[in-house]
Structures are given as C-alpha cells and as structure tokens.
Amino acid sequence: MNTVIMILVVMTIIGLIFGLVLAYVNKRFAMEVNPLVDLVEDVLPKGQCGGCGFAGCKAYAEAVVLDESVPPNLCVPGKAAVAEQVAKLTGKSAPPIEPRVAHVRCGGDCTKAVKNFEYEGIHDCVAANLLEGGPKACKYGCLGFGTCVKSCPFGAMAMGSNGLPIIDTDICTGCGTCVSACPKQVLGFRPVGSKVMVNCNSKNKGGAVRKACSVGCLGCGLCAKNCPNDAIKVENNLAVVDQSICASCSEATCLAKCPTGAIKAIVSGTDLQQQSKNEAAANS
C-alpha cells in the first residue's frame, strides 16, 4: 500500500514539474500574434479552397497582414466585397477583380462520346485516368466519375444524368478546386459575362475527333472565319473564344456555323436540377 502511495506521490511531483516547465517554455518562447490576422480571417469565407495560393484561410490571413507584397484581393470566393474589407483592414489597395466561374470544356456525354472499353474500377476520375487514359476514345474529354463534384467546397456542382458535371454559376466562386481536381484539365475558367464557349478540350485533328465524339471541335475554322468581331481563333486544332472581344452578336454566327455544335451559348441558373435539363437540351 505504501509503495502505491509513494508511486502516486512521485508521479504527481513529476507531473507538476513538467507542467511548470511547459508553462515556462510557453511564456518564454511565446510568439506574439498580430490581432489583425484574426480580424482578416474573420472576413474570409472559410472555404479552405486554396484558391488564393496559400494553405487555407488562416495562412492567407497571416500572409496578407505580415507580408507587404501579398495583395488583399487573392480570395477568389470572397470576390470584390471581401477584397475591399481585407484592403481596409490591412491598409492596402485592392485592384478590381474580374468575376469568374468554372466551366466544363467538354460536350462528350455518355450518348455522344465513343468508348474504347467498359471501366469497372474505382469510381474516380484520377483512378480511371491511370488505365489507358480512361474508357473514352477521346483522351481529352471528361471521364464522368465526378471527382470534381466531390472536390467542390461550396456545393456548386452536381453530376448530370448525361454523365457530365453541371456547375451552378450562382453558387460557383471560381476558387479553382475543381479545376485542380480534374486529371484531364477539362475544367477551366470563364468570365461571368461570357456568352458563348467552346465545349471541347481536344487538341486532336478533325478526323480523329470525329471518330471519338460527335460534338467535338474539328478545328475547321468556320467559326473564326465567320465571326464578325474576329473574336475566335483556332489554336492547336481547337477553337478559342477571346471573351474580351466576343460581343455575342445577335446572329450568333459561330453557333450557326459550327458543324458539330461544339460552340454553345452559356447556360446559367440557380437550380442544379433545372440546369441539368437545360444542359441536356443545349447538348441535344
């Protein structure tokens, strides 16, 4: 019994000694925390998306407060409102931000894209891509397993019934998480005011594209030749729309001239279910 009591006393003394040592170390080597960091972090949306280039909101708050070279407008989800608040707190100037949203640069859904084989592995785009680039004949197209949807920290994406992801542009913050998650680089950004986009990501020549997908861009250049604003160019066998020039002419010349319908008018909406119907109709 005495031995047990002695052990308890010794352990208690050791615990007290360690506690005192830790308290001293904590006080002696404590780093001063700038209260402004917490104030800046409080105005950030807490999406932890990393779109700012830092490892989360706390890291960005520390950087923008402590480093003069870090601008106050890097929080993409926060947009102009958050940029203005951060600028006010830090005494920095916030240049204007062009609002952007993510866009799926592929129209090759399960009814239009040719498959080379049936994939029965892990339901994940990264995993499927490891097997010969995925089951689709087009190695630039969306694999349709929803890795981007799962990665979205704001719930702005859903998988459509046609096997392509749908983006709710009223929820999308343009943070870029889905863009980074896609192994095919199918997802990209577009300005919020965009009117038309090329729903194709293939760099293959027209003949190969036609064999792999019925709605792929052939790189024929008809859209570029007929655009009254000279806003379209063909680069690497793919039509590219310069959104700073495109005025979405009332005739919608590029849409009418595209032989495969790869160029589409932008579809936006707040309800993902309704947008799914709109996307299906637009791709039909």
From Swiss-Prot:
[4Fe-4S] cluster 5 binds at C246, C249, C254, C258. It comes from Clostridium ljungdahlii (strain ATCC 55383 / DSM 13528 / PETC). [4Fe-4S] cluster 3 binds at C152, C172, C175, C178. Residues 133-162, 163-192, 206-237, 239-269 form the 4Fe-4S ferredoxin-type domain. [4Fe-4S] cluster 2 binds at C138, C142, C148, C182. [4Fe-4S] cluster 4 binds at C217, C220, C223, C227. Binds 5 [4Fe-4S] clusters. Its main location: membrane. This is Proton-translocating ferredoxin:NAD(+) oxidoreductase complex subunit B. [4Fe-4S] cluster 1 binds at C49, C52, C57, C75. The complex is composed of six subunits: RnfA, RnfB, RnfC, RnfD, RnfE and RnfG. GO terms for molecular function: 4 iron, 4 sulfur cluster binding; electron transfer activity; metal ion binding. Its EC number is 7.1.1.-. Residues 32-92 form the 4Fe-4S domain. Its cofactor is [4Fe-4S] cluster.
